[in-house]
Amino acid sequence: MKNPTLLPKLTAPVERPAVTSSDLKQASSVDAAWLNGDNNWSTPFAGVNAAWLNGDNNWSTPFAGVNAAWLNGDNNWSTPFAADGAE
C-alpha cells in the first residue's frame, strides 16, 4: 500500500523564489557572498554553505570540511584549506 504523504517525484519542476539584496540585508544571520554580479549567493544555514551558481542550481556543501565553489562552469574554485591555493 502506497503512503499518500510521500514527496512528489524528483522529476517535478522545482521553483525557487527570487532573492533580492533587500531580502539579504534583512536576514541578520545570513552571510551572503554575491558572485559574478548576477545574484549568485551562498549562505551558512545550519552548517550548509550552498552556493547557487549561474541560475542553474549548481551548488556545493562543506561535506567532511570541503567547501568547493564552482564558478562560471569553467572549473574555477576555492576551498577553505589553509595550505590550498588551487584555482
UniProtKB/Swiss-Prot annotation:
Lipidation (3'-prenyl-2',N2-cyclotryptophan): 34, 41, 52, 59, 70, 77
Key words of the record: Antibiotic, Antimicrobial, D-amino acid, Lipoprotein, Prenylation
Residue ranges of coiled coil: none
Propeptide: 1-33, 45-51, 63-69, 81-87
Intrachain disulfide bonds: none
Post-translational modification: Kawaguchipeptin A contains a D-Leu and 2 prenylated Trp, whereas kawaguchipeptin B only contains unmodified amino acids. Kawaguchipeptin A is prenylated in vivo. Upon expression in E.coli of the whole operon, Trp residues are prenylated by C-prenyltransferase KgpF. Prenylation by KgpF is likely the last enzymatic step in the biosynthetic maturation of kawaguchipeptin A.
Cross-link (Cyclopeptide (Trp-Pro)), chain numbering: 34-44, 52-62, 70-80
Function of the protein: Both kawaguchipeptin A and B, which only differ by post-translational modifications, have antibacterial activities, since they inhibit the growth of the Gram-positive bacterium S.aureus at a concentration of 1 ug/mL.
Name of the protein in its database record: Kawaguchipeptin peptide
Organism of origin: Microcystis aeruginosa (strain NIES-88 / KW-MA1-3)
